[in-house]
Amino acid sequence: MGINELAIFKYDDLTDSPSELTKRIDGILAGMEMGDNVIFQSPVWISPEFEKRFIDKVKLYQGKVIIFINDVPPMMFASNEVLMPDFIEVYNKADLLIVSSENMKEYLVDKGATVKKIIIQNLWDIPVEFEKTSETKYLSKLSFAGSDKKFGISEKLKSSDIKVEIYDNRPDNKVIPNNIHYSGYVDEISLLSRLHEGGFGLIWSEDEYIKNYMHYCNSYKVSTYLRAGIPIVAHKSISCANLIEKNNWGILVDTLEEAVEVINNMSEEEYQKYIDSVSKVSFLLGNNWFTKKLLVDAIYKL
């Protein structure tokens, strides 16, 4: 696509004087030419001030700036909420914003974002090939790829009659119910292969703060499960709920108890309909379709 990388590494910018910061940014932008457009992925996990200075410097080259918002730190951590005005100031320097969802767009506009051109990302791509040793089949099983301690999965499902596969390390000094199994950390390719065997992929949190952020952000887990070829189970408030429902990618529920009931009463024919729908988006995710379309749309909308 004719896009070159401008590499930014994470460091403590408080150690830089204003002149040192200018020199650092000049070095990062050494390959730029007048009129070049820049896609800036935010946050860079340095500081809002660094992002402001960086974008201001880019604009001196008389090109346009697309800010691709990967995450919004003031929404992720309660301790960072005070930084929201700083990040809104960063975003308002853009000629175009790429945001995770319609919900995120509405939220940022409500918080003061004034950029007129905004594009919705919707899904992360998973351009990874993996081995498919068998056909995906109906299993009364929920798979969860993530921190059990952070998301509270086993505690909520410990009395359930559904099998739960958690891709996290088994906790020490804890009695594990018979329906809960910990598989530890596995690499992405192995994870996709194992998920492909069947059942459902779970995107969930019992932590209300995290659940609220899921209403706005793009969960990488959604794409992981869809790329693996299995339907997903998520809360009705998830940011991509409309996509899931419209495309028959999985089950949207209010509670995990409701999810277990739906799964246990599902026929193999019903499950196969989900598999047929998911297989289409799995192919697109594996070929970077969403990212390519997103970037082309953004460039042409500038």
Show which residues each predicted segment covers.
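Donor nucleotide-sugar binding/catalytic pocket of nucleotide-sugar-dependent glycosyltransferases
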Residues: D95-V109, A113-F130
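Alpha-helix capping/helix-boundary segments
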Residues: N103-K105, K149, S239-C240, E258
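A short acidic/histidine/glycine-rich donor-binding loop in glycosyltransferase catalytic cores
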Residues: N247-V253
